[in-house]
């Protein structure tokens, strides 16, 4: 089912709990190298680590800082810059992810605010067999392999947040 979005989505506790149910695994760079398919990253440290390892990243979603403020990152030319408040999935983030995936071109999305929830629209718009890699503070990297089951779960969450049936 195709959803149409016309406003920012604000997460509630129920949605947060449902998101925590996602089937992800802690993964290493070697695990990611074995994937061989499209990779989308969320987070500056994760993106930097995969770039250093020579991995080909299709879409990068970053906020130019780390959670603990240990390091900041620089803006890159030709990046898409958007706003996204903590606890929300802004309409501009949704549109940037949708257009980036549909364009089939490598893209960097730089967020003023928080990038953590970008995983949700990435899964919604992402192709089956895409690997989404994001950072888990004090733990490492987590991987979600997009399949029909996780897409269905995300669609349900977005439908509820969007207030449409």
UniProtKB/Swiss-Prot annotation:
GO biological process per UniProt: coenzyme A biosynthetic process
GO MF annotation terms: GTP binding; kinase activity
Family, as annotated: Belongs to the GTP-dependent DPCK family.
PANTHER family: GTP-DEPENDENT DEPHOSPHO-COA KINASE (PTHR40732:SF1), UPF0218 PROTEIN TK1697 (PTHR40732)
Role according to the record: Catalyzes the GTP-dependent phosphorylation of the 3'-hydroxyl group of dephosphocoenzyme A to form coenzyme A (CoA).
Pfam families, alphabetized: DUF359 (PF04019)
Pathway: Cofactor biosynthesis; coenzyme A biosynthesis
Record-annotated disulphide pairs: none
Domain of life: Archaea
Chain residues that bind GTP: 44-45, 63, 65, 115, 138
Keyword Kinase carried by entry: yes
Reactions the enzyme catalyzes: 3'-dephospho-CoA + GTP = GDP + CoA + H(+)
Keywords, sorted A to Z: Coenzyme A biosynthesis, GTP-binding, Kinase, Nucleotide-binding, Transferase
EC id: 2.7.1.237
Top-level taxonomy: Archaea, Methanobacteriati, Thermoplasmatota, Thermoplasmata, Thermoplasmatales
Protein's recorded name: GTP-dependent dephospho-CoA kinase
Top-level EC class as recorded in UniProt: transferase
């Amino acid at each position: 089912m195709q959803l149409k979005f016309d406003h920012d989505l604000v997460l509630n506790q129920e949605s947060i709990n449902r998101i925590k149910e996602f089937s992800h695994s802690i993964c290493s760079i070697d695990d990611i190298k074995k994937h061989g398919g499209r990779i989308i990253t969320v987070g500056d440290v994760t993106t930097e680590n995969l770039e250093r390892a020579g991995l080909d990243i299709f879409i990068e979603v970053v906020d130019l800082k780390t959670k603990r403020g240990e390091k900041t990152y620089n803006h890159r030319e030709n990046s898409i810059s958007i706003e996204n408040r903590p606890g929300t999935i802004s309409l501009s983030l949704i549109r940037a992810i949708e257009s980036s995936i549909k364009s089939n071109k490598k893209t960097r999305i730089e967020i003023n605010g928080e990038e953590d929830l970008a995983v949700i629209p990435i899964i919604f718009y992402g192709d089956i067999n895409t690997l989404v890699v994001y950072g888990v503070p004090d733990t490492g990297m987590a991987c979600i392999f997009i399949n029909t089951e996780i897409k269905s779960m995300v669609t349900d969450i977005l439908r509820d947040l969007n207030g449409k049936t």
